[in-house]
A protein has these predicted regions:
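Charged, amphipathic alpha-helical linker segments immediately N-terminal to NTP-binding catalytic cores
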Residues: 104-105, 118-166, 293-305, 309
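Conserved Walker B
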Residues: 111-112, 141-142, 169, 243-246
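Canonical P-loop GTPase G-domain recognition
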Residues: 143-195
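A conserved segment at the C-terminal end of the G1
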Residues: 198-213
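N-terminal accessory targeting/assembly segments
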Residues: 1-117, 351-366
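Catalytic P-loop NTPase motifs of RecA-like helicase/translocase cores
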Residues: 115, 145-146, 173, 247-249
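Helix-rich effector regions associated with P-loop NTPase G domains
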Residues: 3-8, 61-66, 74, 89-94, ...
């Protein structure tokens, strides 16, 4: 194991990336005042250094992501600068959002204002499950519904395979309980706009001071107030990543794998097997998944979307394909794919082009 301290190098975590600069938070055990020599007293503790990437890393194509564990050398304590010399191996990597070494996803929804929408929640849960990370579900604005209503929602989600934590950022209900699940982990917070994600981060981390958007009355969605990915240090250890808001996650998973993103379906497959190994659980005989579970209709809709997405990718990869697909809104936050004709092939020929063709024809006859 490399002794980074002996070589004058430091270990840290990339907490933000902007342009070609990387903000690196050094490990506390390597950030003791006695080891930092002429460290400027105005630097935070543990110190944050604004770093560049070594040319060697650029040449070998080594990208640096938020969440990366990195080796920093030649620290300039007075200027708060440094250089990233190496990137340690990642144990997980997300592409959207682009973040490394995540341990879990904190999914935040509101139970009221806007009301909880099962289809939208299910879509976010599927996307979270597809990362193979642990999923923690928090339901905000619980002060707006009764305890009886909370119990009904809880029972329903337990049937889905999730035990929600009811919180109220406004009234400070159970926010400390939610914070305990985040200690000593890198957590990505996600969910639709307007449900209180930024407010929750502001509650958990006073230094975050994120801009908070109100819910838009027209679409019952909040304004997208988060512009870039950033990790915030939690008081009890751990880092929390706020990600740029998105309304509907893409259903870009492999159709054959989709069923495993439903915990209630995984339970069925754990005790029995379908007759066919490539069963998609629609109308195949002797299927052990198809049945009277609540989200089965969600599964069928998501399966259609996943198949359409996969078909679109195959057709885009085939330059000889004359049939493309385009996304068309169905309303209620849903979309479907339909054939798209190639404009060049089916576009009406202009009169100018027709005249030029006739002139060429006359010349050929002469």
């Amino acid at each position: 194991m490399t002794d980074f301290a002996a070589t004058g190098q430091l270990l840290g975590t990339v907490v933000a990336v902007q342009a070609n600069f990387y903000r690196v938070q050094l490990d506390q055990k390597q950030g003791e005042i006695g080891e930092m020599g002429d460290r400027d007293s105005h630097l935070p503790y543990p110190p944050l250094l604004l770093c560049t990437r070594r040319t060697r890393l650029k040449k070998i194509g080594q990208q640096v992501m938020v969440g990366d564990r990195v080796v920093v050398e030649e620290p300039d304590w007075a200027g708060g600068r440094g250089a990233i010399a190496d990137v340690l191996p990642r144990h997980s990597e997300l592409d959207r959002p682009a973040i490394a070494n995540v341990n879990q996803i904190l999914l935040v929804f509101a139970v009221a204002d806007p009301p909880l929408e099962p289809y939208q929640l299910s879509r976010f849960l599927i996307k979270a499950e597809s990362t193979s990370l642990d999923v923690l579900l928090c339901l905000n604005k619980s002060d707006l519904i009764s305890e009886l209503e909370q119990q009904k929602v809880s029972d329903r989600l337990l049937g889905w395979g999730y035990e929600p934590i009811f919180i109220s950022v406004k009234d400070g209900i159970n926010t400390d309980q939610a914070g305990k699940y985040l200690s000593n982990k890198i957590t990505v917070i996600a969910g639709p706009s307007g449900v209180g994600k930024s407010s929750l981060i502001n509650t958990l981390i006073d230094s975050a001071k994120l801009r908070v958007g109100e819910v838009s009355g027209k679409l019952a969605r909040g304004r997208h107030t988060t512009r870039h990915i950033e990790l915030f240090e939690l008081p009890n250890g751990g880092l929390l990543a706020d990600t740029p808001g998105f309304n509907q996650p893409d259903m870009d998973c492999v159709p054959e794998e989709l069923i495993y993103y439903f915990p209630e379906a995984r339970k069925r497959l754990a005790v029995a097997s379908c007759r066919f190994s490539d069963c998609l659980h629609r109308d195949e005989p002797e299927c052990v998944v198809r049945g009277d579970w609540e989200r089965y209709e969600h599964y069928l809709e998501f399966l259609d979307a996943a198949i359409a997405h996969q078909t679109q990718l195959h057709q885009q990869a085939d330059p000889e394909s004359s049939m493309k697909l385009k996304s068309k809104s169905k309303g209620k936050g849903q979309s479907q794919y339909e054939p798209k004709l190639e404009s060049k092939k089916y576009r009406r020929i202009s009169r100018k082009t027709q005249l030029q063709d006739l002139q060429e024809l006359y010349r050929d006859e002469e």
